[in-house]
Structures are given as C-alpha cells and as structure tokens.
Amino acid sequence: MTYYQRDLPHWHPEGKALFVTWRLNGSLPSGFRPLPGERSTGKAFLQMDRELDNGTIGPVWLRNPRIAQRVVDALLYGERELKLYELLAFVVMSNHVHVLLQPQVPLPKITRVLKGFTAREANQILGRTGKAFWKDESYDHWVRDDDELHRIIHYIERNPVAAGLVQRVEDWPWSSAREP
C-alpha cells in the first residue's frame, strides 16, 4: 500500500479502485474545514460535496460546455490512449469532478496528467494565464468491496440529479451515465 500526506491523507492499496474528486481552485471558502471528528470519515467528504454542489462560492468554469467536454475527452483519452487507468464512472459538475477508476499507474501521475492538460485547455478557453485552475490536492478514497463500488458508481452518476441540475442521470451530458 502506498501512503502519503499533504493536507489530506492518501492511501492507495495496489489493485484497488479509487474514487477521486478534484475541484476548482477557490471553489470552497478558504476557512472550510470538516466538522470536528469527521475529517477521516465519509461525513467529511459528504459535507465538502454538498458545499461544492451548492456552487455558490468561487468559480464555476466547468459549466462552460467547451471546458466540461474537454475534461470528459481527457478522461476518456487517459483510459483509451494513455492506458493510465480503467475508467469505471465519472461526472463533471460545475466546479468539481468525480472519477472512479482502476489505476494502472500511481494516482499522482494520473492527476498530474489530467489536471495539467485540462487546466491548460480551460485557461486557454477562458483567456487566463498564470493562475491556478484546479485546487492542487485531490480527495481520494480506495474502494473496499463490490458493494461499495456499486454505491460509488450510483453516487457519481446521480450527482447532477442530487444537485438539482437534471431530472434523470442520462440527461447530464458530462457523465459516464451518458457514455455508450
């Protein structure tokens, strides 16, 4: 098992699927912290995800269809061409991305490739230079068993419905629920 820590702890057991969330820089209040006692639980993630789904703080550049599609294209390219992972589920929301993948290389390499490419593409579309697009650290969780895997796929693909953006999962254009 690989372990490292920055602001968040990261455990990556070999052969396990990973649920990864990355968000736009500035998409949570600067003082945002999980409630005491919840940092190492799923409750902390849900608290963060609710804040992100509200989309009331910071940039929402992923609402731009060109940028959202670039992120989807990069995710698919990372799987099909670069062979970095097997992509199990994904959704691009207005200010964050959820991805469930089976890594073929270390997760830091995957996030560096995906976030680096999509940041350059998005900043070009937005006419921005020299500013961070993504928050530098990502949230990740290793999947314990098949039941959890299916719950996470359901969670990811229902995220646009839960956020009130669409009525049906297949109506959200930037999701694995739409992919053939």
Enumerate the language-model features and the residues they cover:
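Short catalytic/metal-binding and nucleic-acid-binding patches
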Residues: M1-P180
